[in-house]
């Protein structure tokens, strides 16, 4: 069974050309593509292109995508962006996403962003029915505490978020 189709490979080649041009609007449109592989890749590309204006698009993916792997990638990506505007979408996903996989990643991402305002959400996540989410909340809370009290190197603190 060949899961990698020529259509997908052709689109990835086109995406590479558009990436070199930093064609943000092209990639924003691809967030609606039928292929979840393309949506995952597109989420990462938008983060790499950079800019806080990408947060709203990735937050929509986190909230609305039908595929939990794509939502997980969006949570991870928001954590890597580290903007304060990422906090509310990540808090919502930590509390409300139907997938344990996504709630876990959103909790970790909150720890990476490093905002004390997320502490209450992470403390609530300690009571999540799924152990990986609870464990992720512990990791994130540990990182928040470390960043607040001991960290001298912001880059290191962001790497230790999970």
What function would you assign to each model-found segment?
Residues 5, 21, 36-37, 52, ...:
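Alpha-helix N-cap/helix-start positions at coil->helix boundaries
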Residues 8-11, 42, 74, 106, ...:
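Conserved hydrophobic register position within alpha-solenoid helical repeats
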Residues 14-18, 45, 77, 109, ...:
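Core register positions within helices of long alpha-helical scaffolds
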Residues 18-32, 51-63, 83-95, 115-127, ...:
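Amphipathic alpha-helical scaffolding segments comprising HEAT/armadillo-like alpha-solenoid repeats
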Residues 33-49:
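Short, contiguous, helix-prone interaction/anchoring segments in small proteins
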Residues 46, 61, 74, 78, ...:
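TPR/Sel1-like alpha-solenoid repeat signature
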Residues 129-135, 139, 154:
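Solenoidal tandem-repeat scaffolds enriched in leucines and small polar residues
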